[in-house]
């Protein structure tokens, strides 16, 4: 651990545990100055959450009228990032875990003046292969890794939580706007999400930011890659993404028709 990182962690911990501060301003990065919950991953506040190269490429995709689906929105990082550019479009943020939803709502309230056109819509359910009720793990020690995939290697003994879920294709049929970009970070359920978006992928060909989780479900990465290649997508592995857990990989996926 470098000295700066140590000092930043120490500063956050003192403010959280000694001074009982629930929120601090983010130190650096694209969300510098945003107020953020101190109980979340400290990398958010340090401005080091997610890979810089990935963020740059995603920002190049975003336009003022983009429709952005944030699947596995957690506490809102990518939704806030997209909102910096999307002025006339819409951001659907999907997050089923109540604790994350509560923090996301507090971030919306605390950063209200920074949010352009109030276009972030928080959807409190999961996205999967079909409309159904799924049972999530609800482990507070695994706040960013809870999943409904029964075979997950990380599904530790914990409380369970029933949540509603729906597919992307069903959502569009029921009035949700067609996505231009879909971010998928759903802890091993990414293949289910793709299965529930077959029509959308074939007809509308949205761009994808896909996180695969072999750490949850061994082989899920190759399964998703093969699925998308059959659908005509070209994938780019983000080599510079610094993942702390083996089996986590990020991909940018664009349909071949959009490259010509």
Regions found by a protein language model. Give the residues of each.
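Conserved Rossmann-like nucleotide-binding pocket used by diverse enzymes
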Residues: 69, 92, 123, 164, ...
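Acceptor-substrate binding/catalytic loop of class I
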Residues: 99, 158-163, 210-219
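Short N-terminal helix/helix-N-cap motif within the alpha/beta-hydrolase-1
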Residues: 77-80, 102, 132, 191-195
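S-adenosyl-L-methionine
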Residues: 1-166, 172-176, 240-241, 246-260
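Short, glycine/acidic-enriched loop or turn micro-motifs at the edges of active sites
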Residues: 73-75, 98, 127-129, 186-188, ...
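Conserved acidic-Pro-Pro-aromatic motif
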Residues: 89-93, 170-260
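Conserved phosphate-coordination/catalytic loops
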Residues: 48-52, 159-166, 188
């Amino acid at each position: 651990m470098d000295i700066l990182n140590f000092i930043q962690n120490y500063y956050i911990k003192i403010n959280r545990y000694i001074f009982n501060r629930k929120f601090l301003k983010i130190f650096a990065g694209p969300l510098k100055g945003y107020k953020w919950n101190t109980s979340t991953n400290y990398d958010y506040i340090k401005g080091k959450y997610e890979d810089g190269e990935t963020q740059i490429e995603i920002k190049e995709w975003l336009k003022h009228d983009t429709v952005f689906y944030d699947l596995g929105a957690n506490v809102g990082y990518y939704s806030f990032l997209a909102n910096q550019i999307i002025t006339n479009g819409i951001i659907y943020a999907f997050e089923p875990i109540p604790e994350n939803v509560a923090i996301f709502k507090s971030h919306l309230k605390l950063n209200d003046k920074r949010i352009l056109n109030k276009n972030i819509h928080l959807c409190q359910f999961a996205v999967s292969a079909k409309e159904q009720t799924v049972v999530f793990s609800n482990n507070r020690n695994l706040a960013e890794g809870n999943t409904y995939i029964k075979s997950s290697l990380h599904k530790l003994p914990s409380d369970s939580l029933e949540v509603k879920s729906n597919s992307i294709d069903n959502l569009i049929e029921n009035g949700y706007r067609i996505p231009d970009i879909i971010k998928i970070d759903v802890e091993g359920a990414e293949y289910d999400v793709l299965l529930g978006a077959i029509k959308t992928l074939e007809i509308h060909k949205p761009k994808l930011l896909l996180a695969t989780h072999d750490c949850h479900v061994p082989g899920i990465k190759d399964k998703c890659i093969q699925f998308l290649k059959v659908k005509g997508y070209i994938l780019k592995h983000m080599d510079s993404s610094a993942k702390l857990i083996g089996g986590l990989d990020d991909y940018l996926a664009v349909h071949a028709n959009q490259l010509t």
